[in-house]
């Protein structure tokens, strides 16, 4: 009961300290509130295990200790924690740790660490903030876990607990790891440290005292550990290792990321283009051709859409790179400027800028020539093909004679075919092909019309030359008159 009272008092203090921050962050609370509710079981399990299973929580903590021991500052913390006597040493604690660290003391000690360690904490906080933007709601959830009342108290503290402060802070530090936010987090850490002692250090292992993983501020480690907690236990076990690795690796990378975000996100929609151009700008002479090669490869779509027609995309790529090499200085400036207004499309405005900087002779003349050079070849080639494929239509006299012969016999003998070829000034091959085509046409017509085969043959074969030759098939015109409407158009094609 004393613990509960102490916790309540400390929580009230925290709430008072945090109200002014929360007023600013009320609009974020709902969003983060949902996030906290989604932090599934581990939070509640920790709150429920305050009395029953402290050893579970400290197993997590101990795992973190084991992994985190890498950084010297974390070693210091571990020493401090171990030096402090434990209020609750369950057999599991005794097995895993001789003296399980009483969390709250460690948290307080961290706050009182020498200045260099605090600086390290700040750095790590900033880095972890950037890492843990997604995980911040979890950190907040831990503080609610500190309340012995359980999930209900957790939800209440979701509104008041420092994690709301951390959420906005950590989101903003994403690109700018501001010292102010880190200071706020240290305040929160202190608050957590104050809360922890009242909690009989049971909740603490998952809360502020979890920090042994990398001396980085307790809050940050809480974020890491909690982030892993909602991922379920296997992730937690793997987590501390990742925490140390990420804290070490991100120490290098977060600086670069912050640099990219601050400097280049203003101009770019995507971080990948940022990197290439980040290198291209400072060293236009040496590395700018690389940027240019990137440019043509990434920009064919944009070049065609913005400045060029799809017809000479390849042409444009070649000449863009060439023009860029011709005037490295001009193109470097141009390539840097357009992103400001072309963020949605990446580098869509780039080609036009490139042309303007490189000069009309370099860029626009290419634009004019690009489409023209292939076209003449295409026209010549198509012209040749069209000439080859052109078929001189048969004269009316030739078609009429062939139709007459087709009436007598759809299949022409070699003798007759030779005579027709000589009389009509055609080759035998032409005559043969004409009869083949005529038979096919007749067949199709007969299929389309469900009339008798005779009617189809008569109509399809005779209506073309019905006016000219009426000697032997005048009797068919009665049938033709019925079918002429259908076949006239077909036969004269």
From Swiss-Prot:
It is found in: Nucleus. Pfam families: Homeodomain. It comes from the Eukaryota. Keywords: Developmental protein, DNA-binding, Homeobox, Nucleus. Isoform M and isoform R are expressed in ectodermal and mesodermal tissues and central nervous system of fourth to ninth embryonic abdominal segments. Later in embryogenesis, expression is seen in visceral mesoderm surrounding hindgut and in two Malpighian tubules. Residues 1-29, 54-95, 105-134, 154-173, 329-345, 447-475 have a biased composition (Low complexity). GO terms for cellular component: nucleus; polytene chromosome band. Residues 1-199, 322-360, 438-475 are annotated as: Disordered. Gene3D superfamilies: Homeodomain-like. Residues 30-39 have a biased composition (Basic residues). Residues 387-446 bind DNA. One of its GO terms (biological process) is midgut development. Residues 144-153, 174-184 have a biased composition (Polar residues). Sequence-specific transcription factor which is part of a developmental regulatory system that provides cells with specific positional identities on the anterior-posterior axis. Belongs to the Abd-B homeobox family. This is Homeobox protein abdominal-B.
């Amino acid at each position: 009961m004393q613990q509960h009272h102490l916790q309540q008092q400390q929580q009230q203090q925290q709430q008072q300290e945090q109200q002014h921050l929360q007023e600013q962050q009320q609009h974020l609370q709902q969003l983060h509130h949902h996030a906290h509710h989604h932090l599934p079981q581990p939070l509640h399990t920790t709150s429920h295990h305050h009395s029953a299973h402290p050893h579970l929580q400290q197993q997590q903590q101990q795992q973190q200790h084991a992994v985190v021991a890498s950084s010297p500052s974390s070693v210091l913390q571990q020493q401090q924690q171990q030096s402090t006597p434990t209020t609750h040493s369950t057999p599991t604690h005794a097995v895993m740790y001789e003296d399980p660290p009483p969390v709250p003391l460690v948290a307080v000690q961290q706050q009182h660490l020498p200045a260099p360690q605090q600086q390290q904490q700040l750095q790590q906080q900033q880095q972890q903030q950037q890492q843990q933007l997604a995980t911040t709601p979890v950190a907040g959830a831990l503080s609610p876990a500190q309340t012995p009342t359980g999930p209900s108290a957790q939800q209440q503290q979701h509104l008041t607990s420092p994690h709301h402060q951390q959420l906005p802070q950590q989101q903003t530090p994403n690109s700018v790891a501001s010292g102010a936010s880190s200071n706020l987090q240290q305040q929160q850490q202190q608050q957590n440290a104050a809360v922890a002692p009242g909690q009989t250090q049971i909740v603490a292992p998952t809360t502020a005292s979890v920090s042994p993983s990398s001396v980085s501020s307790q809050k940050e480690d809480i974020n890491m550990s909690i982030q892993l907690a909602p991922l379920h236990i296997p992730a937690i076990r793997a987590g501390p290792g990742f925490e140390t690795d990420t804290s070490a690796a991100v120490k290098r990378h977060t600086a670069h990321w912050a640099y990219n975000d601050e400097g280049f996100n203003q101009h770019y929609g995507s971080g990948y283009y940022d990197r290439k151009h980040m290198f291209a700008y400072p060293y236009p002479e040496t590395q700018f051709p690389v940027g240019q090669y990137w440019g043509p490869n990434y920009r064919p779509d944009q070049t065609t859409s913005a400045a060029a027609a799809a017809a000479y995309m390849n042409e444009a790529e070649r000449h863009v790179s060439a023009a860029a090499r011709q005037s490295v200085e001009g193109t470097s400036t141009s390539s840097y400027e357009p992103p400001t207004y072309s963020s949605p499309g990446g580098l869509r405005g780039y080609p036009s800028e490139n042309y303007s900087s490189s000069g009309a002779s370099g860029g626009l003349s290419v634009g004019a020539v690009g489409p023209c050079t292939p076209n003449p070849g295409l026209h010549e080639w198509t012209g040749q093909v069209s000439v080859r494929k052109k078929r001189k239509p048969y004269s009316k006299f030739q078609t009429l004679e062939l139709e007459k012969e087709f009436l007598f016999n759809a299949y022409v003998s070699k003798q007759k075919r030779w005579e027709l070829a000589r009389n009509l000034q055609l080759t035998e091959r032409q005559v043969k092909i004409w009869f083949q085509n005529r038979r096919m046409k007749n067949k199709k017509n007969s299929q389309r019309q469900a009339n008798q085969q005779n009617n189809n043959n008569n109509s399809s074969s005779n209506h073309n030359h019905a006016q000219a030759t009426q000697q032997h098939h005048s009797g068919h015109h009665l049938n033709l008159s019925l079918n002429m409407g259908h076949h006239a158009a077909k036969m004269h094609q």
